[in-house]
């Protein structure tokens, strides 16, 4: 096993988003009046979503509610100190209402899932970051915002096509740190109901 992959397993894939990248995301977001639900299904210690919530420009009559899901017990306890509600669980084992969230902040674990698929397109879509996106994108309400932080190498043609079919007003920019070769994809969930 490659040392970098082994290190990822030791940390349970936990690599928090840097503050400069979070600031770049926050300055691009605006919320209207009303209740706004912000979800981080890989919330770690909750600091990223808490920072986003505190820096997002929002209407004075809007109420921001932060929700996190975290697998690691110690990190979930820390997250509960700065987020409104934290569930200690695997994001894949949770039931989150479809169309219930205004913002989905997603910096998922990265890497290939063990698969016997030989087809490259299927292999590309079996990556962890893709699986997290597919599982959690339905939690966004129509016109809700996805803030996805992934290595640019994960943006295979199949994954890019998946995102392009489901998002509109897409903006992509490099993360502030070059350490993981990450990009941020911001996009609004498209209306999938058809004409």
Where on the chain are the PLM-derived regions?
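S-adenosyl-L-methionine
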Residues: 1-33, 48-50
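Conserved SAM-binding loop
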Residues: 79-80
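Conserved phosphate-coordination/catalytic loops
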Residues: 15-20, 123-130
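Core SAM-dependent methyltransferase catalytic element
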Residues: 183-195
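Conserved proline-anchored active-site loop of SAM-dependent methyltransferases
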Residues: 25-28, 37-54, 68, 72-73, ...
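Conserved S-adenosyl-L-methionine
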Residues: 54-65
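Conserved Class I SAM-dependent methyltransferase catalytic core
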Residues: 125-186
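Active-site regions of enzymes building and remodeling cell-envelope glycoconjugates
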Residues: 83-88
């Amino acid at each position: 096993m490659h040392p970098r992959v082994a290190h990822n397993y030791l940390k349970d894939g936990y690599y928090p988003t840097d503050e400069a990248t979070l600031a770049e995301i926050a300055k691009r977001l605006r919320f209207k009046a009303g209740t706004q639900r912000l979800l981080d299904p890989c919330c770690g210690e909750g600091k990223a979503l808490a920072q986003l919530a505190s820096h997002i420009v929002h209407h004075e009559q809007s109420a921001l509610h932060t929700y996190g899901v975290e697998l690691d017990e110690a990190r979930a306890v820390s997250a509960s100190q700065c987020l409104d509600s934290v569930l200690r669980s695997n994001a894949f084992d949770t039931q989150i209402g479809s169309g219930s969230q205004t913002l989905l902040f997603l910096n998922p674990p990265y890497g290939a899932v063990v698969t016997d698929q030989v087809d490259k397109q299927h292999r590309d879509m079996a990556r962890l970051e893709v699986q997290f996106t597919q599982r959690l994108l339905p939690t966004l309400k129509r016109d809700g915002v996805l803030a996805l932080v992934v290595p640019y190498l994960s943006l295979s043609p199949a994954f890019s096509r998946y995102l392009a079919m489901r998002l509109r007003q897409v903006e992509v920019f490099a993360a502030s740190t070059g350490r993981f070769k990450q990009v941020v994809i911001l996009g609004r969930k498209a209306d999938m109901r058809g004409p």
